[in-house]
Amino acid sequence: MAKIVNFYPVGIQTFENIREGNYLYVDKTKYIVNFREKKMKFIFLSRPRRFGKSLFASTLQAYFEGRKELFEGLAIAEYEKEWVKYPVFHFDMSGAKHMDAETLVSYLNLELLPYEKLYGKGEGETYPNERLEGIVKRAYKQTGQKAVVIIDEYDAPLLDVVHEKDNLQQLRRIMQNFYSPLKKLDPYLEFVFITGITKFSQLSIFSELNNLENISMFDQYSAICGISMTELTSVMKPDVEGLGDALGLTYDECLEELRLYYDGYHFSKHSEDVFNPFSLIRAMNGQAIESYWFGSGTPSYLIKSLQKYHVNVMDIETKGVTIDDFDVSPEQMTSALPLLYQSGYLTIKAYKPLTKSYQLGYPNNEVRIGMLRSLSPNYLSPVSTDNNGLVTEFIDFLYDENIEGAMNRLKAYLSSISNRLSNKNERDFQTVFYLIFNLMGAFIKVEEESAIGRADAVLQLPNTIYVFELKYDGSAEDALRQIDDKGYLIPYTASGKKLVKVGVNYDSTQRTIGEWLIRKG
């Protein structure tokens, strides 16, 4: 294994610990400079889980506490000359998940307690909102400096109960009450920074803080969290080379693998490409490209949303959404797509100015394969090892250029799940094949749609490109004819690889493949 040049902060989200421990820190302090130069005061930022929000919040805390020594060599060191120490109140709401009303109130009180030890507690301050207001005012009076309030993962107590109407209303009232003093505390506040995954529109921080700037979809802040390609190829270049050595890849090949697996996040109309920092850091540290972020768990609220809205896997990447869809509170959503975007399972692929709509899609292979594997038991075999076995064996046959063996394996698999295919229509058949071929993207390149359209599946192997066209109660000959008539092979004629056309017909009466034809391109 090649030696790792950098120390990677796996599991560390505190700016102080990263800097003092000499861990790799990707400098995001230019964004703090931007906030201060623009005199921005109330800011909201939405990003997916484990995407660097907490680290940025911690960086802000250290800055406003005047911790000059932690910022040596960073962008902000050239800007800041005074390093004023402000009283900072940092509330981490990620610890308030899965709570009932009574437990949530207790949690808020415990969050306030350390600050009351610093600045005292006023008589009659019983409820969390009263206590918050009191400590901010006393801090201002005692220090002579306005306060900074940082609320990280503000929506964490609410997301897991978003589909529990009564519980949601109770917890929302508690949180609304807690955040309510922020507006009237304006004269005592220097800066307020709030992070979360989504936007609960009826919470007071949005309904009352009319000067709250939501920077989540601004181009200039698209890379405020996560790691850009420029950042990867500068501060992490030696370790990309080391990872390539470990995987038997050149530097450019390794960079491409990382891009395909972890890059592709876009958070605005003209966003930079952003890598998932959680996965990228673990890949560098462990010198292996694995499913780190997706494998760390799918939130229960997201699973419930997928069930509630009956999401079809083929629709996920085809429907557009508008800016208004992003602003809908989770409990008022009529589609799972905005929540899938906010949670990091979809990202912006394109912006269409004419309709002012956003085309969403999977950001990268890690998320695409993870989502398809999670959803496949609803359409294919409920036993995931059956599905994975089909995919790997099919690909093995293709590597051996044994297309007959691959098709016979697919036919046998479809026969084994024929009961799940009974009373299904052509759309269901298309979904089954969509899943099977896209799951192969974990191992080989599966083509996306091109300008001239696409065949049902295009599978790229090192020496051969296979183009599949599927028919439902038609004929394999018609499928081959469509490949020729539509010119599906044209984009690959200059590849230098062997081209193979495969026409397939699905027989609905037998509930499996009826026939197939194979011809060289």
Predicted regions span which residues?
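Structural motif
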Residues: 148, 464-466, 500
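Active-site metal-binding core of divalent-cation-utilizing nuclease and nuclease-like domains
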Residues: 139-143, 436-462
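Phosphate-binding site recognition
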Residues: 1-425, 440
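Domain-level recognition of nuclease-like catalytic cores that cleave nucleotide substrates
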Residues: 491, 497-521
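Mg2+/Mn2+-dependent nuclease catalytic core
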Residues: 168-173, 472-489
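Conserved catalytic cores of phosphodiester-cleaving nucleases, focusing on short active-site segments
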Residues: 433, 455-472, 486
